[in-house]
């Protein structure tokens, strides 16, 4: 579908240009900067919603709202944007999560202008990545995230923030090298004039050995972001030290960039290599679920416990994509959106607990259920959502991944049975570490009592943020077609099934 207005360029550019305007805002405290940034985020989300309702056709199974402009001719880089069901779902998630993360950052009082500037730059870069139709532009948007996250970690992180930020940069930059080499190889192979346009690259073919090498190059970059075991070790350190509003963006959006790349590039452009390596992806995804769950159970720091739970849940995304079935891929897409909501909400809850106690150590906490019933109720409800309680979004997504594995025609019965058993063990381990965390936080001895100055229950702003997360979690769980009716339009053809 073609529109006279370049809507995608507008939603990519608006946060970036709005962020560049922050230095000229009045310097009379933090209030103006806060409300300005929140207003931009709300405006951006309203524009995304408008585009979805007025310019996007769910029944049209192709890229819509295409925009292509020459940008840098010397390197054949085009400003090429387009949107389909996969990208639209993640764009909506990005707008929703970023708006609530901005509101959650209200207590920050140090260098607020720089903080909100970095958040807006991240916002524009994430939207740009999900709508890119040029593989070099995709890489450019991929790299935009690096500096804002590094600075957010360094300036507003915990005691080990420099170590965590450096580790994040090394992992991400290392993966980006593989991504760039793979993208250049794909674009230059067999062409006198290189083309980075994804639509053109769909029709290119490669020798199988070269296709596998290109696939692995992309996979390494995505394995860092997603993350996939064993490239995950940056994530617990980063989440453990970052401010909780930054964690909301990391868990809610940043991790989904890897899953999006696996579907958009590896599955769509490198189908034969994906068929060959899909079983390995499923195996590593299953190992990741078990491994991260076991490590999570041993964490005394409950923020790191939530971080390891994120790694475990993203294993279902890897399995769903590797299943090579439409059901499994739909489950992976739904799991990305579901975890984006649940993970961001849990990190916000972890931050609200820290604001009151100044500690993340479970053995120093307990007894909060009586003095803070609202916090207890929301933490319990969202933890149940994380362990895939029926009626919540996580249940539907994990069920679809299970069904995708079982119904796949590409793998032997023994292999599918083994993956299914490992997934089942993971779903059993999840309530163990989550319910144990709830018990240590809210029961036990009375750290929180009526005389304790930290025993302050959730305020209106915090309740509003959590309810905003909870409503779509329940909505998707009760009526998953809210997402599947959008996401199913973009599933690439699977000629080998």
Swiss-Prot record:
Enzyme Commission code(s) on record: 7.1.1.-
EC class (word): translocase
Reactions catalysed, as given in the entry: a plastoquinone + NADH + (n+1) H(+)(in) = a plastoquinol + NAD(+) + n H(+)(out); a plastoquinone + NADPH + (n+1) H(+)(in) = a plastoquinol + NADP(+) + n H(+)(out)
Protein's cellular compartments: Plastid, Chloroplast thylakoid membrane
A GO term from the CC aspect: chloroplast thylakoid membrane
GO biological process: ATP synthesis coupled electron transport; electron transport coupled proton transport
GO molecular function, one term: ubiquinone binding
Membrane topology: Multi-pass membrane protein
Primary location recorded for the protein, binned into one broad class: plastid
Keyword Ribonucleoprotein part of the UniProt annotation: no
Membrane-spanning segments: 5-25, 36-56, 88-108, 112-132, 135-155, 168-188, 212-232, 243-263, 275-295, 306-326, 331-351, 387-407, 418-438, 463-483
Highest taxon listed in the record's lineage: Eukaryota
Keywords attached to this entry: Chloroplast, Membrane, NAD, NADP, Plastid, Plastoquinone, Quinone, Thylakoid, Translocase, Transmembrane, Transmembrane helix
Similarity section: Belongs to the complex I subunit 4 family.
HAMAP family per UniProt: NDH1_NuoM (MF_00491)
Protein name (database record): NAD(P)H-quinone oxidoreductase chain 4, chloroplastic
Species: Adiantum capillus-veneris (Maidenhair fern)
Gene: ndhD
């Amino acid at each position: 579908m073609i529109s006279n207005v370049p809507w995608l360029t507008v939603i990519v550019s608006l946060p970036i240009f709005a962020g560049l305007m922050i230095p000229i805002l009045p310097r009379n405290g933090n209030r103006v900067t806060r409300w300005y940034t929140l207003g931009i985020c709300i405006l951006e989300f309203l524009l995304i919603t408008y585009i979805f309702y007025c310019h996007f056709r769910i029944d049209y199974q192709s890229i819509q709202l295409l925009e292509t402009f020459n940008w840098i001719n010397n390197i054949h880089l085009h400003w090429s944007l387009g949107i389909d069901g996969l990208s639209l779902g993640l764009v909506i998630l990005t707008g929703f999560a970023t708006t609530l993360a901005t509101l959650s950052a209200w207590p920050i009082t140090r260098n607020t202008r720089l903080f909100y500037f970095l958040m807006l730059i991240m916002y524009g870069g994430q939207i740009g990545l999900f709508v890119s139709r040029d593989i070099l532009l995709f890489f450019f948007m991929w790299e935009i995230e690096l500096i804002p996250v590094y600075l957010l970690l360094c300036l507003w992180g915990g005691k080990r923030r420099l170590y965590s930020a450096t580790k994040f940069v090394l992992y991400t930059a290392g993966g980006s090298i593989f991504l760039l080499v793979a993208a250049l190889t794909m674009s230059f192979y067999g062409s006198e004039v290189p083309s980075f346009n994804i639509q053109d690259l769909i029709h290119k073919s490669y020798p199988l050995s070269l296709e596998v090498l290109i696939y692995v190059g992309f996979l390494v970059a995505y394995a860092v972001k997603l993350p996939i075991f064993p490239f995950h070790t940056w994530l617990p350190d980063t989440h453990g030290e970052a401010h909780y509003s930054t964690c909301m963006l990391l868990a809610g959006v940043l991790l989904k960039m890897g899953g999006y790349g696996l579907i958009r590039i590896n599955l769509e452009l490198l189908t034969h290599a994906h068929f060959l390596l899909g079983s390995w992806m499923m195996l590593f995804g299953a190992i990741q679920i078990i491994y991260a769950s076991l490590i999570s159970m041993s964490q005394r720091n409950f923020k790191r416990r939530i971080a390891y739970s994120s790694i475990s849940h993203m294993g279902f995304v890897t399995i769903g994509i590797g299943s090579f079935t439409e059901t499994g891929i739909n489950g992976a897409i739904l799991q990305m959106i579901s975890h984006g909501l649940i993970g961001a909400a849990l990190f916000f809850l972890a931050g609200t607990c820290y604001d009151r106690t100044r500690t993340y150590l479970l053995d120093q906490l307990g007894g909060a259920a009586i003095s803070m019933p609202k916090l207890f109720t929301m933490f319990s409800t969202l933890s149940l959502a994380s362990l895939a309680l029926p009626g919540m979004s996580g249940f539907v997504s994990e069920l679809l991944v299970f069904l995708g594995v079982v119904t796949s025609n590409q793998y032997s019965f023994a292999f599918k049975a083994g993956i299914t058993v490992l997934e089942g063990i993971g779903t059993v381990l999840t309530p163990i570490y989550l319910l144990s965390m709830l018990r240590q936080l809210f029961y036990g001895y009375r750290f929180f009592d009526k005389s304790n100055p930290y025993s302050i229950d959730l305020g209106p702003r915090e309740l509003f943020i959590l309810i905003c997360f909870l409503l779509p979690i329940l909505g998707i769980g009760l009526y998953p077609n809210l997402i599947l009716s959008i996401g199913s339009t973009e599933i690439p053809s699977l000629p080998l099934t």
